[in-house]
Amino acid sequence: MATWIWILIVIVVGLACAAGGFYGARKYMENYLKDNPPINEDQLRAMMLQMGQKPSQRKLHQMMAAMQQNARKK
């Protein structure tokens, strides 16, 4: 076979692997987030009650904002 055919085959296989990897990782993350959803305000309120703190709406919003800001940094 000609060299250009081998190069074309390698490029096509590389693109197919990249697309398959992308969709596989995407499906994995969708399933992971479905099984382990991010924490919401109700869960945060329950956690604060278990720690013996009285959760005010202001404190809940502060903690949610801090967690979202911390998640963006990573």
Swiss-Prot record:
Predominant localisation class: membrane
Superkingdom: Bacteria
Coiled coil stretches, renumbered: none
Family annotation (Pfam families): UPF0154
Keywords: Cell membrane, Membrane, Transmembrane, Transmembrane helix
GO CC aspect terms: plasma membrane
Membrane topology (UniProt): Single-pass membrane protein
Family membership noted in the UniProt record: Belongs to the UPF0154 family.
Protein name per Swiss-Prot or TrEMBL: UPF0154 protein LVIS_1358
Organism: Levilactobacillus brevis (strain ATCC 367 / BCRC 12310 / CIP 105137 / JCM 1170 / LMG 11437 / NCIMB 947 / NCTC 947)
